[in-house]
């Protein structure tokens, strides 16, 4: 498989009519014009903004599309459902293909019944919730109360979930049972000429332990102190266990039965993440999502690290984030290792950003990425970030126009 991709890239093979349609997807960022807590904000206006710059043409093999992240534990279920329906209706009204991203890992503010184990004065309090969050050692006595996230700026967030907790995983599956049928029903009712509007459903969101929700030594004591005094330490990509912060993952590793003493090793964290994603994908598949429309979102930071394996499972197509190697995916050894072993019909660059505002750099990067016909879509994170770099839109247009 890898050899086929590499030869196709070098030779610039064009399959023309035999090649599948591919997509450049623009992710509309939560909190920047769209927010599921305000369902009406996911309506036609945000689609029209994209279409004004990138109108689709039926004769183009590369089409543009829109995506949004629905964080299922961030808002009450009825609000999330309404937001999803508004989003899907707008996609149909504007004939815009979409990727529905369902996030079960981040922003679980609306489910204190899962994470609040320490504050009896607040909703959801239950000491047993220690089992649903991560620990800094092998005992639930070392459960964490706080975590930090840095997606451009460090902020305080709720604890990293225990990805192996039966109660937490069941809550994730319950939300899939709530949302996935809505997407499938919508797709089923589309006329034949609009069936292509559902590119796919993506599960997971850079699934990892300690990557997007990390903890500092003595972090629980910081909860009662001003955030301005919080430590800020650089992300250490080479440290595949703790990323240079406090080691967590003990809860998930112990709950999953991998080990309950000694030191955590790299395969432990990989196996937990892979099993978690496979569980979610199996649930979605059982609900009726075909493999070619189901994507699992993995990530890796150190070249070739085992975490890249996490999104590969029998139920979905693997997908990864690309920042460091966005200019040339052939250099991403972790992704290439998994493309060579995956039997999935497709894969995706489901979170993508090239750190350049140069039009030709973007054109060339997209050409390299989509030279593999198995790459279903590239999702640019985010649409809102493009405004500061006019060359990005120019590069995308140039690439699309160059395709037959």
What spans do the regions from the language model cover?
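Well-ordered, non-membrane alpha-helical segments in soluble/globular domains
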Residues: 37-55, 76-87, 169-187, 268-282, ...
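Sec-dependent signal peptide recognition
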Residues: 1-8
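Aromatic-lined substrate-binding rim segments of carbohydrate-active enzymes
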Residues: 43-149, 277-284
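Acidic (Asp/Glu)-rich catalytic clusters
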Residues: 49-61, 85-95, 309-313, 335-343, ...
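Boundary at the C-terminal end of the N-terminal hydrophobic targeting segment
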Residues: 15-18
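The substrate-binding groove and active-site-proximal loops of carbohydrate-active enzymes
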Residues: 30-39, 67-79, 156-178, 259-274, ...
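Polysaccharide-binding and catalytic clefts of secreted carbohydrate-active enzymes
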Residues: 129-308
């Amino acid at each position: 498989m890898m050899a086929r991709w590499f030869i196709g890239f070098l030779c610039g093979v064009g399959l023309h009519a035999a090649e599948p349609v591919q997509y450049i997807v623009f992710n509309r960022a939560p909190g920047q014009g769209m927010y599921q807590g305000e369902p009406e904000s996911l309506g036609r206006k945000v689609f029209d903004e994209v279409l004004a710059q990138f109108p689709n043409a039926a004769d183009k093999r590369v089409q543009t599309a829109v995506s949004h992240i629905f964080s299922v534990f961030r808002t009450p279920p009825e609000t999330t459902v309404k937001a999803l329906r508004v989003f899907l209706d707008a996609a149909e009204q504007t004939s815009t293909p979409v990727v529905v991203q369902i996030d079960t890992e981040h922003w679980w503010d609306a489910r204190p019944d899962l994470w609040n184990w320490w504050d009896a004065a607040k909703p959801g309090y239950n000491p047993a919730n220690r089992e649903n969050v991560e620990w800094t050692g092998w005992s639930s006595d070392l459960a964490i109360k706080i975590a930090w996230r840095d997606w451009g700026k460090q902020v305080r967030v709720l604890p990293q979930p225990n990805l192996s907790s039966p109660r937490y995983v069941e809550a994730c599956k319950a939300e899939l049972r709530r949302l996935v049928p809505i997407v499938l029903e919508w797709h089923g009712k589309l006329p034949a000429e609009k069936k292509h509007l559902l590119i796919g459903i993506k599960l997971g969101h850079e699934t990892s332990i300690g990557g997007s929700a990390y903890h500092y030594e003595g972090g629980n004591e910081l909860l009662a102190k001003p955030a301005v005094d919080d430590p800020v330490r650089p992300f250490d990509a080479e440290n595949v266990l703790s990323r240079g912060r406090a080691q967590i993952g003990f809860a998930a590793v112990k709950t999953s039965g991998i080990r309950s003493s000694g030191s955590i090793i790299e395969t432990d964290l990989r196996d937990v993440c892979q099993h978690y994603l496979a569980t979610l994908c199996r649930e979605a598949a059982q609900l009726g999502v075909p493999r070619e429309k189901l994507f699992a979102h993995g990530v890796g930071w150190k070249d070739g690290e085992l975490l890249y394996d996490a999104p590969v499972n029998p139920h979905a197509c693997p997908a990864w984030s690309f920042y460091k190697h966005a200019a040339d995916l052939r250099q991403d050894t972790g992704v290439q290792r998994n493309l060579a072993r995956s039997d999935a019909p497709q894969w995706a660059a489901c979170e993508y950003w090239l750190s350049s505002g140069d039009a030709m750099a973007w054109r060339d990067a997209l050409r390299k990425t989509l030279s593999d016909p198995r790459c279903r879509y590239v999702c640019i994170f985010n649409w809102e970030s493009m405004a500061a770099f006019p060359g990005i839109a120019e590069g995308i247009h140039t690439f699309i126009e160059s395709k037959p």
